[in-house]
Amino acid sequence: MAKRNIFRGLAAVLALGMCMTGLAGCGSEKRADGKTEIEVVSYKPEAVKAFEKIEKRFNETHDDIHLTISSPNEAMTILKTRFIREYYPDIIAIGGDINYSNFLDADLFDDISDLDEVQTVKQAYLDMDKELEFIPKDGTYALPYAANAAGILYNKDLFEENGWKVPSTWQEFTTLCDEIKQSGTLPLYLGFKDTWTCLAPWNALAVGLTDSDTCNQVNMGNTTFARTYEPVAEKMRALLDYAEKNPYAYGYNDACTAFARGQAAMYPIGSYAIPQIKSVNPDMNIGSFTFPANDEESDNVLNSGIDLQFSVMKACKNKEAAYEVLKYLYDDETIQIYLDDQGGIACKDGDFAIPETLEDMRPYIENNRMADYQDHHYPSEMSVDAMIQTFLLDTSDNAQEKFLKKFDSDWKRYNRDLIRKVQDYQKEQEDAQ
């Protein structure tokens, strides 16, 4: 059975269980030493060292609260299992994606709009969380913490040596690719053997060429993917003219290695790939720019998503202690500890350093010209990454038409219940007017 269908089943169990047990099972209990225990479960095992440092500093400075932060492997599976058993942590730390949407839809999170720190979050990231709500809800249910960005990585030394300039429009981008190609250098490396890599340029193009609430508009029946994704599909295929021969024979690691060795001038992938690239070439001078998807620079949008955010469980018995933890986590010094370890962009307004590799994206970050990854709204069982790869492999004259038609039909198939729910809500709102 598909993962999302499983969780929808769990949501019904959770709703019944909460009604029957009064939201029992939360971790905020008194310890033997009299301190209130607050448990945070994070889905990022790669950040365990940063969280260990933060946990230690918190416990050294608080006499009445003991903080435990765990970052297990397979955290999402563990969390879903715990939710079924009604053994809830106090706070969970997850990304702004479809899992957040499902948990919120299951009514697991408490409204934290009365937390002062919410007022210090960059508006773009608050908007992203709102767009992840299946049905609009009053309140705020997550505290965005750290974000990532995806566009096009480029070899800064190669650009400088050849006098190439970072493009700001689609025309400038294709002209640059032609110039690089004529110089004997490969403009792009794609590495589409691993299907998930197809989503990197797809998302980066889509945020600039479509509205950020496209998926919700489709659910409401106001548009179709065949209409809105047409320019995205066209420009995805255009990338193939500037990439390695048969990109489906090379995976993510191959692409990172090739780019690290100077075999391509650019790599359309997120900043998360930089550590892998630098493991091959530690001295590589890497930059990253916003995908110039449009004919006018002013229409471009940076693809940025919430990599980590904190939500207080509705089952939490000690909201005051949970808030004290969130306040500490949102202190500038604490945020910097996390960013120094994990990189990325602070979701909080303030004077936080932007990684040098993302410097070209600074104007977009500082001016909130950002939109979430489209695939954060896609159900996993729809396998959009594989659909994109299949489309790109298809050389028939009507390949794009078939792809977009399938996108619409599969969307209805895998989102039937959600579409009905959204349209019922829409009708209720219209009837109430």
State where each predicted segment sits.
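Extracytoplasmic/periplasmic solute-binding protein
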Residues: 137-145, 150, 174-221, 264
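Hinge/lid segment of periplasmic solute-binding proteins
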Residues: 95-150, 174, 180, 200-203, ...
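A structural signal for short loop-to-beta-strand junctions that line the ligand-binding cleft
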Residues: 81-82, 89-90, 119-157, 186-190, ...
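Conserved C-terminal helix/tail region of periplasmic/extracytoplasmic solute-binding proteins
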Residues: 160, 336, 369-433
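Glycine-centered hinge/linker elements that transmit conformational signals in sensory
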Residues: 179, 218-248
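Extracytoplasmic "Venus flytrap"/periplasmic binding protein-like
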Residues: 57, 61-125, 157, 161-162, ...
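Mature extracytoplasmic/periplasmic domains
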Residues: 57, 108-111, 261, 272-276, ...
